[in-house]
């Protein structure tokens, strides 16, 4: 006997599946309007217009099978907290696949990323506060991060500040200790047995042979008295 059909839960992720199932005449629960799946467990296929394999946001191609909160993190400058805040403000399910986002939702995400402060994001949530050129609080993404950091380092070097001095010589900038890490000199060689190799011409070097015909060196030691 065939197993009874399974009634799928009503979730935002499956909203489009229910709409497609209604169009194709699939079995629906008369009480809740949920989609029934037979014993095979196959879902109705979505058309190419509803699901997108690649979604482009801010010049980044995001795979459609990724969850929204995971896919947005592939954009440089967006972390987990920022991605979650974006989806919460726009009322988008975190677990929904990016491929199911509509064009309007994608446009709203890009609009919010261009001006997060205007959307109500707090100042401490942004990664570029009180910009030296404009004085504005903004959030930068992708290649703008590298460009901005490079300009900041160059400005410190030109101004001759202590930060610029450390950057110029490739040293640590933020007060880290450099006794063990951050060294650049060559390694000191040690002989087998743990003894340090003697320096050339030092105390451990063998005495040089006396030149032929030369008088032996005089010693200042006193002569012993004969008994």
Swiss-Prot record:
Residues 217-227 have a biased composition (Basic and acidic residues). One of its GO terms (biological process) is translation. GO terms for molecular function: rRNA binding; structural constituent of ribosome. One of its GO terms (cellular component) is cytosol. Keywords: Ribonucleoprotein, Ribosomal protein, RNA-binding, rRNA-binding. Pfam families: Ribosomal_S13. Residues 178-227 are annotated as: Disordered. Residues 193-216 have a biased composition (Low complexity). Residues 183-192 have a biased composition (Gly residues). Part of the 30S ribosomal subunit. Forms a loose heterodimer with protein S19. Forms two bridges to the 50S subunit in the 70S ribosome. Belongs to the universal ribosomal protein uS13 family. Located at the top of the head of the 30S subunit, it contacts several helices of the 16S rRNA. In the 70S ribosome it contacts the 23S rRNA (bridge B1a) and protein L5 of the 50S subunit (bridge B1b), connecting the 2 subunits; these bridges are implicated in subunit movement. This is Small ribosomal subunit protein uS13. The gene is rps13.
